[in-house]
Amino acid sequence: MVKAVIFTDFDGTVTLEDSNDYLTDTLGFGKEKRLKVFEGVLDDTKSFRQGFMEMLESIHTPFPECIKILEKKIRLDPGFKDTFEWAQENDVPVIVVSSGMKPIIKVLLTRLVGQESIHKIDIVSNEVEIDAHDQWKIIYKDESPFGHDKSRSIDAYKKKFESTLKAGEQRPVYFYCGDGVSDLSAAKECDLLFAKRGKDLVTYCKKQNVPFHEFDTFKDILASMKQVLAGEKTVAELMEN
């Protein structure tokens, strides 16, 4: 029986830097314009889908080159590997639910958990279309203003997990880990939201009165999840806001 499920964002959550921001800042229209574009997303005058597309369309570097650059530059949260290994030992599924691009996520995540373990992590994300000249564009997962409505993806998984419950069995505890605006819809689908300290998601949660628990690294997340599953603390006790 599955006692808990970890849903997590990827960029800026599993990674210490956001791969899409890095590509935009160094190969696209730069950090200043990116921040300007996302002001509109934060104040709801522009959809995440539109803002993200503007960022990516400013990058003209061939896709394989982008991957090589990211492999050298993007660091991964060292606590994630311990969390993943604990999850494997305790039959806790780990599902990456991302507004980024699957090929990038798969390459970077393989570097962290290893080729033999990557198939144990589900990745639900946008795809990439690459032409004969290695030019590329994002293919959004759905038609929503997010490009990928994470709440829909999470809801589908919840239905799958709960459909196998036997009489009297409790449903799993759903955890979500994130850092940005695109994580808000996902957060509302889960029992406990871990929001990265100092990032947009914390600001947004305070503005929208969404309960959350702040974290710095996955070491904090792992410690809190262990407390909940051991019955030492309730989800409500860990919530802030």
Curated annotation (Swiss-Prot):
Disruption phenotype: Impairs the ability to metabolize cellular polyol phosphates which may build up to toxic levels in cells. SUPFAM superfamilies: HAD-like (SSF56784). It catalyses: D-ribitol 5-phosphate + H2O = ribitol + phosphate; D-sorbitol 6-phosphate + H2O = D-sorbitol + phosphate; sn-glycerol 1-phosphate + H2O = glycerol + phosphate; D-erythrose 4-phosphate + H2O = D-erythrose + phosphate. CDD domains: HAD_Pase. One of its GO terms (biological process) is L-serine biosynthetic process. Its main location: cytoplasm. The keyword Transit peptide does not apply. One of its GO terms (cellular component) is cytoplasm. The active site is at D9, D11. It is an enzyme of class 3 (hydrolase). It is found in: Cytoplasm; Nucleus. Transmembrane segments: none annotated. GO terms for molecular function: glycerol-1-phosphatase activity; glycerol-3-phosphatase activity; L-phosphoserine phosphatase activity; magnesium ion binding; ribitol-5-phosphatase activity; sorbitol-6-phosphatase activity. It holds the Pfam family HAD. Mg(2+) binds at D9, D11, D179. Its EC number is 3.1.3.50. The keyword Amino-acid biosynthesis does not apply. Gene3D superfamilies: 3.90.1470.20, HAD superfamily/HAD-like. NCBIfam families: DKMTPPase-SF (TIGR01489), HAD-SF-IB (TIGR01488). Present with 12600 molecules/cell in log phase SD medium. Hydrolyzes sugar alcohol (polyol) phosphates. Dephosphorylates a variety of substrates, including: sn-glycerol 1-phosphate (D-glycerol 3-phosphate), D-ribitol 5-phosphate, D-sorbitol 6-phosphate (D-glucitol 6-phosphate), and D-erythrose 4-phosphate. Prevents accumulation of toxic levels of polyol phosphates, which can impair glycolysis by inhibiting glucose-6-phosphate isomerase. This is Polyol phosphate phosphatase PYP1. It comes from Saccharomyces cerevisiae (strain ATCC 204508 / S288c) (Baker's yeast).
